[in-house]
């Protein structure tokens, strides 16, 4: 996406009173063994896009680990590359970098996420906490993953999944303990965003209808927040 395109899209969004909370970037979604210089240049462009959209967050990853190799063997290289991201990002202090736990990257389990964030020790980096992705890595989301990352969570992804087959479901219909996480976040004073995701949800009656899938996902979240937790829905 060019910056000229961004300005066009931004005008349309403004006309419809829509704002962008986060840029869902592909940064860090390459192999840890891939060349890095071009990717670092792309990262700067993503930051420029975020500025143009007035988005306070950029979602990122911590690199795919080669199959069959221990993720811990690449910890130092992951930290090195993220520190290079932060060196660029310091010129964009209004933007927070979000590390998403994604299957098969370095930070796909909470222990690695916590280790990375602790070593970076930078307030410009937070966790984008995704319950479904943890389930797909056979990780207990609550209390285990939440307790390890609760002080670093800056953004929530709302989707769920089953341990048995790793299929994604609407919130509350899987094993991701989404309601327990949301209750804990509220109790902990969380004031960030929650991004509702329909991607990956497989429900026969909706087939590939994106609008229907979003409605299903939205209704599932509304049930948790309004009916179960007594929160407002505006």
Q: Which stretches of residues belong to each language-model region?
A:
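N-terminal substrate-binding region of glycoside hydrolase catalytic domains
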Residues: 1, 24-27
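Aromatic- and glycine-enriched glycan-recognition loops and surfaces
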Residues: 1-7
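Short, conserved glycine- and acidic-residue-centered signature motifs
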Residues: 2, 39, 74, 78, ...
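Active-site acidic/histidine proton-transfer and metal-coordination neighborhood
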Residues: 7, 12-15, 29-127, 136, ...
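Short phosphate-binding/catalytic loops that engage adenosine nucleotides
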Residues: 18, 95, 190
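Conserved beta-strand positions in the central sheet of alpha/beta enzyme cores
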Residues: 22-24, 59, 98, 154-157, ...
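Histidine-acidic metal/acid-base catalytic patches
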Residues: 54, 110-129, 135-234
């Amino acid at each position: 996406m060019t910056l000229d395109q961004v300005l066009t899209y931004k005008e349309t969004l403004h006309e419809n009173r829509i704002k962008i909370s986060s840029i869902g970037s592909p940064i860090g979604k390459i192999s840890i063994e891939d060349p890095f210089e071009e990717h670092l240049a792309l990262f700067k462009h993503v930051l420029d896009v975020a500025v143009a959209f007035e988005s306070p967050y950029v979602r990122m990853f911590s690199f795919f680990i080669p199959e069959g190799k221990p993720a811990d063997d690449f910890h130092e290289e992951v930290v090195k590359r993220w520190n290079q991201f932060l060196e660029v990002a310091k010129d964009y202090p209004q933007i927070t970098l979000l590390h998403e736990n994604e299957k098969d990257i370095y930070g796909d389990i909470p222990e690695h996420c916590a280790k990375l964030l602790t070593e970076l020790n930078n307030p410009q980096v937070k966790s984008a906490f995704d319950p479904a992705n943890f389930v797909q890595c056979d990780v207990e989301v609550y209390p285990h993953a939440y307790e390890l990352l609760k002080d670093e969570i800056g953004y929530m992804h709302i989707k769920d999944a089953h341990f048995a087959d790793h299929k994604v479901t609407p919130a509350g219909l899987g094993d991701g303990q989404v309601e327990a996480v949301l209750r804990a976040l509220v109790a902990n004073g969380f004031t960030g965003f929650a991004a509702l995701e329909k991607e990956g949800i497989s429900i026969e009656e909706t087939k590939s209808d994106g609008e229907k899938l979003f409605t299903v996902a939205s209704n599932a979240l509304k049930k948790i927040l309004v009916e179960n937790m007594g929160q407002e829905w505006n």
